[in-house]
Amino acid sequence: MIGGRLIKVCGLRAADNMRAVAALPGVDLVGFIFHPASPRCVTDVPDVPLPDGVRRVGVFVDVPAEQIVATAHRYGLHLVQLHGHESPDMCRRLTDRGLGVIKAFPATPEAARNDTTRYATSGCRLFLFDTPTASHGGSGRTFDWHVLQDYVGQTPFLLGGGLGPDARDALSRFTHPRLAGYDLNSRFERCPAEKDVEALRTFLQRLDGASVPGQTSPASVRP
């Protein structure tokens, strides 16, 4: 965590890169994308021991629940991130199978106000707000964070959508009572699925030195 915020680094593939990212101070979640259309798609997750407290997240798009459960068991995923049109009932079924669920939403006023309400009792551990794209994330494009003023739910959320090395000052000014952390991906890459470890290290150090307002209690959001 950095300043009480979860840090998720998504879109990993190679063992050495995963090991280096997971070892960075502040990283809580490392993500693997199981969506064939993504340039960061994985067909296998390296069997790399993680530091204490770091959790594996699998990202899926409109995949049957049983397939998600099987993949999670095979690779030791602690959480699953659902980035498609998965229903509240599916989220609940996965939760009942012992998986932490992160449900992603396009960052639109409609999603922030209404779509999230349908998932309020689905057992989701976290929500994720990302830039609306046909590619289901990883676009490197940002969105207007003011949209999230329309979100008044109780489920903590991760902020995604093109966060890059230049985002620290804006993040230090952004407040929301349910902001739990940040999702970092394509703008910290040398090429798809290869994270720039030094760029991440520098960003996290600078973020740690910034004043991050409106902290959420770590006990309420840590997976």
Task: Identify the role of each PLM range.
Residues 1-223:
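Conserved N-terminal beta1-alpha1 strand-loop-helix module at the mouth
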